[in-house]
Amino acid sequence: MFDYKLVVIIGNVGSGKSTVSKMLAKKLGAKLVPADKFFEINPFFPLALEDRKRWSLASDLWFLKERVKLIKQTLLDVENQDVVVDSGIPMSLMYANSRLSSGFFTEEEWKLYESIYNELTRNVPKPEVVVYMRATVDFVREQIEKRGREFEVKHHDGKYLTSLEESLEYVARKLKSEGVKVVVWDVERQGFASTAENLEMLAGRINLMSVTRDGDNPCWSLMGV
């Protein structure tokens, strides 16, 4: 239906998403959609940081609406060009799902979010390939400490990062059930995907999977999910 590949990179905080997205886009000659900075203009985000139970739903729905608009416009703008998205819509679903496990969403709020998510994304092309940068909580905490971003160090404790990783597994399974090909890159076992050798391997996998029939399932396409 489309003449371009849509590749989305997902993963926990500190798993290397942004670095891999930039290098992979360059490697594939693709348009890069970097991680958005909607948190800077989301009117509900600072409120949610102060009272997550009260404001998380409004904040997450605002993020979802803007990310859907962004990807729709991006796909309208490209002509026969591959697109690599850092985080994007699947990460909106991941964050919202983590609110449920963390107790910031009620079951009713999660069902409402899900129904709105399904409606807003109904006519948005699904990615051909999603790359899931899988890493343990201990590993990403170490990366967060190394890069020293004050907001992350303050707000991203072990419990929060664990809820994100569990929700990433949920999103990966959901995407696969919808026919999306998922490459799982084990950051600790395989190393950062941004090294020259690993980037070459990852680009090769994506190119192969983008032309693989829906019924095919290469052994590395969904490792352990």
Language-model regions, residue ranges each:
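Hydrophobic anchor at the beta1->P-loop junction of P-loop NTPases
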Residues: I9
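P-loop (Walker A) phosphate-binding loop of NTP-binding proteins
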Residues: N12
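Conserved lysine of the Walker
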Residues: K17
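Post-Walker A alpha-helix
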Residues: V20-S21, A25
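Conserved substrate/cofactor phosphate-moiety recognition/catalytic segment
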Residues: K26-E66, A96
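Glycine-rich phosphate-binding loop used to anchor ATP phosphates in small-molecule kinases
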Residues: W55, S59-P125
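A glycine- and Lys/Arg-enriched "phosphate-lid" helix/loop adjacent to the NTP-binding pocket
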Residues: M94-S167
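NTP-dependent small-molecule kinase module
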Residues: R141-V225
